Amino acid sequence: LRATGLILMKGRGWEYGKRLTCGFIMRVDCIVLGAGVVGVSTALHLQKRGRNTVLVDRRGVSEETSFGNAGLIQREGVYPYGFPHDFGALLRYAMNNTIDAHYHAAAIPKLAPFLFSYWMHSRKVRHEAIARQYATLIEHCVSEHDALASEAGAQHLLRRTGWMKVFRTAREQDARFAEADRWHADFGLNHRKLDAPALRSAEPHLTHDLIGGLHWTDPVSVSDPHGLSMAYLARFEALGGAFLKGEATTLNQSPDGSWTVVAFDGTVITARDVVVCLGPWADLVTQGLGYRFPLAVKRGYHMHYRAEGNAVLNHPVLDHERGYFLAPMLKGVRLTTGAEFATRGAPPTPVQLGRAEPIARQVFPLGERLDAEPWLGNRPCTPDMMPIIGPAPRHKNLTFAFGHAHHGLTLAAVTGRMVAEMVTGEAVFVNPEPFRPARF
């Protein structure tokens, strides 16, 4: 120790050393890169299993994609969002003037290979096969969040109200009702069909122009998605875990097989295992390790509003034909938009919010804006619409957990448990084979 200038101290299960000339060394069992809701859930599950874990992110916890989602734990979401094959829908999206989809024309050449593969995987037979595999994750999404939220004292953030699609035309309503019946038969998903009077009873402050709704009753909504992540973080830290700010691209594997990451304060974190939960930024690490995953981002925007007068929104609501979503949050009514196809880091273009706001005001009495500017987030997407979860094919003690697209919040607790079971050598409670990184 004198020769190396290292002073070792014991933390709560981890070794923390101070090298007199070059900062701190922190020895732990696991490093989790990325402190979105997937990363926080993974770190918590590892810490619960006695693996001393450090969570690392360049920003605060859940300050990127996980901050601004629609707040749904989508128990009904067995079919991941596919690329449309209907010619009318494709023509409508090509006009680039809708709320549910928008694209940067300059980005299309770069995105074209991804979009073509996405389109191919969205063909009916293939999409149905994907849904059967995806459902093995989705079926546990509520129960796994319930378990973590109970431990973290965050059950008050979970609302058991489900969510609603509301309709303007009988054609769309009939089609979605028939689809819901098929999903109930195939996957046991529960719903209520609402005619106009039933919808007005459930949501008296929505416009009476709507003809009905589909109420998915199994999902859970979250009144403060960022608050849920912070509760999971607090539980993780109470069990002895640590969160440090640092740059994931400093990840390096030593000759002895251990992994190191350097925090912004100079701390060198070293561990046997590392888990990459970097969402849309995963490629910044994986490409340097020789992996070329076909990732793309779907961007999304949100804005909060005060409800006018005594108006109350009782459920999260999707205006199906218009393509925007209203969710009651602690901060106000959150208006979210559909997907924007652009390159990661391109300047914000919140045109979808601009299109949605006047229509949403006709549906529900929104008051003043509560945010200084629109929020922008990036959803990490794979062309087969399934996340990448599992051990890296060519590196020991490296595990991937990213690519959850629209279902990062939904699948965070499920993914965290799966990864922790993989790392600790337990039997994995969901068959991980369909989600293995090696499929790409």
Language model features: what each stretch is:
Residues 71-73, 77, 81-120, 250-253, ...:
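Active-site substrate-recognition segment that forms the wall
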Residues 29-54:
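N-terminal Rossmann-like FAD-binding beta1-loop-alpha1 element of flavoenzymes
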Residues 48-67:
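Glycine-rich FAD pyrophosphate-binding loop
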Residues 112-231:
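Rossmann-like flavin
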Residues 237-248:
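A conserved beta-strand/loop element that lines the FAD pocket in flavoprotein oxidoreductases
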Residues 321, 365-440:
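C-terminal catalytic lobe of FAD-dependent flavoproteins
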